[in-house]
A protein has these predicted regions:
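Short, well-structured alpha-helical segments in soluble
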Residues: 17-25
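His/Asp/Glu-rich mid-to-C-terminal helical/loop segments that flank catalytic regions of hydrolases
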Residues: 160-190
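Single conserved hydrophobic/aromatic residue that forms the stacking wall/gate
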Residues: 1-8, 12
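Mid-sequence, gly/pro-rich, charge-dense loop/helix-turn segments that line enzyme active sites
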Residues: 39-127
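A C-terminal functional module that forms or caps the active site or interfaces directly
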Residues: 112-159, 165
Length: 190
């Protein structure tokens, strides 16, 4: 078992960290945990989202005829998570933090902290995401390029709307604590 943490803020540094894991440590899977803003009304602060897939909501080559989110030159721009890891993570969540809602859905990533309703609605309507954050899709892309199963796990810290900055500070610690409980159980099951 190898756990790695990256405090880098930009998506390319996350890809590099994932590539290092693939190249030098020959990892069997990549599991990334963190926090995110909810894009759905039924997903509340403290709940957990397990990625079914991930994509970059701020990739925009529409001037060249691409759909929003499509990465030019890539055959795939939506990266599918491992069903086996999703199943194991769901069981670990329900066992370790049964009081939380556990959702399976799309994680969308972009180089921005979403904190207004208009941006939230645009991202939700265009990309059908369950939550938004900054690095999951970059990690998923690197895992895909290396043919490594992956899972992105996000504890919800805010509602990605006008209250996001206030919610984030208040709920960040709780969201992280829930992620740690679940991750410990998941690693034990793998």
């Amino acid at each position: 078992t190898l756990l790695a943490s990256s405090a880098a803020s930009d998506v390319y540094k996350r890809q590099i960290c994932t590539q290092i894991l693939a190249t030098y440590f020959k990892v069997d899977a990549v599991i990334n945990t963190g926090i995110a803003g909810s894009l759905k009304a039924e997903i509340n602060i403290g709940d957990v989202v397990l990625s079914t897939d991930a994509l970059q909501h701020d990739m925009d080559a529409t001037n060249f005829g691409y759909e929003p989110g499509v990465i030019p030159g890539m055959k795939v721009s939506t990266f599918k998570a491992s069903e086996e890891l999703i199943e194991k993570a769901e069981k670990a969540c329900k066992r370790e933090v049964p009081e939380l809602g556990v959702f399976k859905g799309r994680v969308v990533s972009g180089d921005q902290f979403v904190s207004d309703k208009a941006t939230k609605n645009r991202i939700a309507d265009t990309f059908h995401g369950y939550c938004t954050e900054m690095e999951g899709a970059a990690i998923a892309q690197a895992a895909y390029l290396n043919n490594i199963p992956f899972l992105i796990i996000r504890a919800i810290s805010d509602k990605a709307d006008d209250s996001a900055a206030m919610d984030y500070d208040e709920f960040e610690r709780r969201a992280i604590a829930n992620s740690v409980k679940m991750l410990r159980a998941l690693v034990a099951d793998i």
